[in-house]
Every structure is written in C-alpha cells, then in structure tokens.
C-alpha cells in the first residue's frame, strides 16, 4: 500500500473583475449629473442652453477682459466656472466619449481613493485643465466658453497610469482583492508600458486637438474644437496628485506597501 505524501497544489484564486456596471457610487452619481445637465441643455430650449453656458461655462474674458467682457456676474463667478464648466458638453458625442472614459478610468481610481479623495482629485484636475486652456487663449477667444468634463476625465487617466501597469503587490484589506502598487514618479519614465500609454494618449489628444470637432462651444451650442490644453493640464495634474492623496498601507510583512518585502527588509 502506498500513499501520496506530496501536497496537492491548490488552484490560485483569481481576483474577481469589477465590471463597469458595478462602478463605485460616486462615479455613477457624477455620470448621472453630467447626463442631467446635458438633457437640460438639449431639451430645455435654446434660451436655457444659453443661460447654462453663460452661467457655468468657463469664459477667459472673466479673467482677462476689461469689465469681464460684458458678461454678467463678478470675478467670483469666474472662479466658480473653473469647476462648473465640467458639467456642460458640446453635444452627445462629447458627452458619450467623456462618459465612457469616466467609467473606464474613474471606477478603478474611485475604488482606490474612496469617494471624497476621488472627487477632490477629479475637481482639481478639472480646475487645472481649465486654467491651462484659458492661459493659452488669445484675445479673439475670450468670449468662447470652454465646456466639458475632459480635463477631469484626463486627470483620472493620468492617475490610473500610476498604478495600472505595475505588478500586483499586496492585498487591499478594504476591497479584499489584490491591489496594484502605486508607481513612484521616478519610476514612470522607466516603465515602458506607462511611457507608451502616455505617448499614445498625447498623440491622440493632439490629433483630436487639431482636427476634432468638440471641446469648445459657442452660445448657440455649435461645437468649435477640442480644448486640448485642458486635457494636458488635467492629465498631468492627475498623474502628480494621486501620489499625494494615497497613503501607503502596511504590507502583511509589516513593511510599507509601496515596496517588496525584500526591498523593505534591505532598507531597514
């Protein structure tokens, strides 16, 4: 009689993938808000659309033109529109594209940061995107409103680039699933997948910036072109900011979660 004393290998458990329809509530609420504002601008009539654009759109004139370029409100409203312009879109294509990318990149970032830090990251990226766009706008474009969530969505892409291409290193105690290590900024240019992702994103963004029909809109609702600098400002804001918002957890070995156990042990 013989017996097999060798332990049988147990199949590795694969982490459950998170479908888009199970995106965190904060992402779905944000998406719903974008849709509601667009429905108001589309079905509320031309007068309401103009009113929304004047009230919420980001006009460079509110920052640089004498007398706010004749626009109503004060400079305070100009500051508010650095954020509120993200709620409006130039058309259904503009909204759908931003919605798809919001779900694709916003969901993993929201799971990682939680709702409050996610919204803070998103809105700061919206702001930096808007600032970048108005700073490169010349006098002839002062009264052309900048609208769209593209700066915030681009920021989520930049944030995701810091962890989407790293190795699975530790178990997230909250989600009970493997979590990818956040790359240090110094590692980003040394990771080929990250560099390729950023390079492809830049090429596509610049191409649409030169040729694309959406991103800016005049008061009549006609789209003009892509606010490509807003994309750049948001993307790189997200790439940098996520490292300030995420607190590295401790690994099971007691070392910081941003390094392998061997690395941590050797650094003690």
Positions of the model-derived regions?
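A detector for small-residue-rich transmembrane helices and their helix-helix packing motifs
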Residues: 2-268
């Amino acid at each position: 009689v013989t017996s097999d004393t060798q332990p049988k290998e147990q199949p590795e458990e694969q982490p459950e993938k998170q479908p888009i329809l199970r995106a965190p509530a904060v992402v779905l609420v944000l998406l719903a808000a974008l849709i509601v504002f667009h429905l108001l601008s589309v079905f509320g009539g031309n007068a309401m659309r103009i009113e929304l654009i004047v009230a919420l759109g980001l006009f460079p004139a509110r920052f640089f033109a004498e007398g706010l370029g004749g626009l109503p409100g004060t400079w305070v409203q100009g500051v508010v529109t650095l954020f509120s312009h993200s709620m409006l879109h130039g058309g259904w294509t503009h909204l759908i594209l931003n919605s798809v990318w919001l779900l694709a990149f916003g969901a993993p970032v929201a799971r990682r940061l939680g709702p409050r830090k996610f919204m803070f990251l998103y809105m700061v990226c919206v702001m930096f995107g808007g600032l970048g766009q108005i700073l490169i706008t010349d006098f002839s474009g002062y009264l052309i409103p900048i609208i769209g969530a593209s700066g915030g969505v681009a920021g989520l892409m930049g944030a995701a680039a810091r962890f989407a291409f790293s190795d699975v290193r530790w178990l997230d105690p909250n989600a009970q699933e493997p979590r990818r290590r956040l790359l240090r900024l110094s590692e980003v240019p040394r990771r080929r997948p990250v560099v390729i992702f950023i390079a492809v994103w830049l090429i596509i963004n610049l191409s649409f910036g030169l040729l694309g029909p959406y991103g800016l809109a005049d008061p009549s609702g006609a789209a003009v072109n892509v606010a490509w600098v807003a994309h750049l400002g948001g993307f790189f804001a997200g790439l940098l900011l996520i490292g300030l918002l995420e607190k590295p957890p401790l690994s099971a070995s007691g070392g910081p979660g941003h390094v392998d156990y061997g690395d941590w042990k050797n650094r003690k």
